[in-house]
Amino acid sequence: MCEVSTTEAEKLYIIDFTERTMSVRKVEIHTKIPFIPETTTEMDGLTLNNATSLSVDHVIFDDCQFKDEKGLQIEHCECCLFPSSGNEGCWIMFVEIKDCKPKNIAVYKEKCKSQLVSTIQDFRKHNLISDTNKVHAVI
């Protein structure tokens, strides 16, 4: 089961370590820019500005979290974030990150989009988000 974590940091850094650690580490959310493992070089990733220090919950999905009726794994994005004190009509953000070579960006763009759509559909199917939630998808 995935754990919900909370932060009020002014900046959140969503980083995909998968390629750089040969899958030892995966996606992580940090409040300070992390370094590429075993270097002093900062990792690239998604930076979310939280200037008002809103309390934000976030969940990083594991590889076995999403399954269809037959128990088969369905594609999904990396994580979601939402206000800690959210209500039925609040926003939710789904994120998919690919740490890839520039030549692969065009290929991964459609894959990312498909993963985001699949995750959002699954959340709606299981009534985890309603039609009144404002949904953001970030690649």
Question: Where are these predicted regions, by residue range?
Answer:
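Conserved catalytic cores of phosphodiester-cleaving nucleases, focusing on short active-site segments
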Residues: 79-81, 91-100
